[in-house]
Amino acid sequence: MQKEALRYLQNAKELLSKTAIEEGIYVDKKYVKSACGVAYLGVLEAINAYLLKRGVPKKDLPKKVEEYEKALKKYATIHNGKLPRLFDALYEELHIAGYYRGMLHRVDTVRSALKGAREFIEKLK
């Protein structure tokens, strides 16, 4: 359900509110990493809900990023051919750069990534 995916984004914003900002940069990267991870989970939750609505059995939902890419190409390209590319960008920004490597520090960069996640989720109605 899209509502649940958006709740993940709200949780990500709450995590970010726990760290100070100095000169446009988040001070505590632990909260930034956590927020990026939670936001990415929201994206995955939205895809799962979309696939379930399209008749994909719960046991057949994707478990790896490559499987999510294939599922989007198979089920969502008809409605919006840009979704697989947007998903790839969110995977790289939120999961890899933000969560896994902890490379996102600037407030505007993180906010832009969260905005992109929200837009992606809203396109999966």
Question: Would you name each region that the model predicts?
Answer:
Residues 1-125:
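Terminal alpha-helical segments
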